[in-house]
From Swiss-Prot:
Pathway given in the UniProt record: Amino-acid biosynthesis; L-histidine biosynthesis; L-histidine from 5-phospho-alpha-D-ribose 1-diphosphate: step 3/9
Biological source species: Streptococcus thermophilus (strain ATCC BAA-491 / LMD-9)
Cofactor: Mg(2+); Zn(2+)
Keyword Metal-binding: yes
Record protein name field: Phosphoribosyl-AMP cyclohydrolase
Similarity annotation: Belongs to the PRA-CH family.
Enzyme Commission number(s) from the entry: 3.5.4.19
Catalytic activity from the UniProt record: 1-(5-phospho-beta-D-ribosyl)-5'-AMP + H2O = 1-(5-phospho-beta-D-ribosyl)-5-[(5-phospho-beta-D-ribosylamino)methylideneamino]imidazole-4-carboxamide
Record GO biological process: L-histidine biosynthetic process
Enzyme class at the top of the EC tree: hydrolase
GO cellular component terms, A-Z: cytoplasm
Recorded GO MF terms: magnesium ion binding; phosphoribosyl-AMP cyclohydrolase activity; zinc ion binding
Cofactor notes: Binds 1 Mg(2+) ion per subunit.
Gene: hisI
Length: 112
C-alpha cells in the first residue's frame, strides 16, 4: 500500500469519496470521510464515513447489514478526493436501491 497524505484541510476536514462496485464500476454513492473514518477504513477494510447530517462517524452497514468491503482505494491528482471500489452487501442507498444514482435527469443514450 502506498502511503499518501490526503488534503483534509481544503474542505473543512473532509474529503469526498466516490464509491463504486468493484466488479462493474457502477457508481454506488458519494459520501465524505474525515481523518478518523479514513483510518478506520484502512484498518478494517470496511467503509467508514463522516455523516454530515448526524455529525458523527458512520460505519456503513453497522445498522442495515449492508456492509461495504474495500477492494481498492485511489486518490485524485490533488489528493483531496477518493475513489473507492467496494464489494457491496445489499443496498448502498438508504432507500433500498443498490445505487444512490437511480434518478435520470437526462439520458441521450435511451437506445442503448
Amino acid at each position: 500500500m502506498t502511503e499518501v497524505k490526503l488534503d483534509f484541510d481544503k474542505q473543512g476536514g473532509l474529503v469526498p469519496v466516490i464509491v463504486t462496485d468493484y466488479k462493474t464500476g457502477q457508481v454506488l454513492m458519494l459520501a465524505y470521510m474525515n481523518e478518523v473514518s479514513y483510518q478506520l477504513t484502512l484498518e478494517t477494510k470496511q467503509m467508514h464515513y463522516w455523516s454530515r447530517s448526524r455529525n458523527e462517524l458512520w460505519h456503513k452497514g453497522a445498522t442495515s447489514g449492508h456492509f461495504q468491503h474495500v477492494k481498492s482505494i485511489k486518490t485524485d491528482c490533488d489528493w483531496d478526493t477518493l475513489l473507492i471500489a467496494v464489494e457491496q452487501e445489499g443496498a448502498a442507498c438508504h432507500t433500498g436501491a443498490y445505487s444512490c444514482f437511480f434518478t435520470d435527469i437526462y439520458d441521450d443514450n435511451q437506445d442503448r
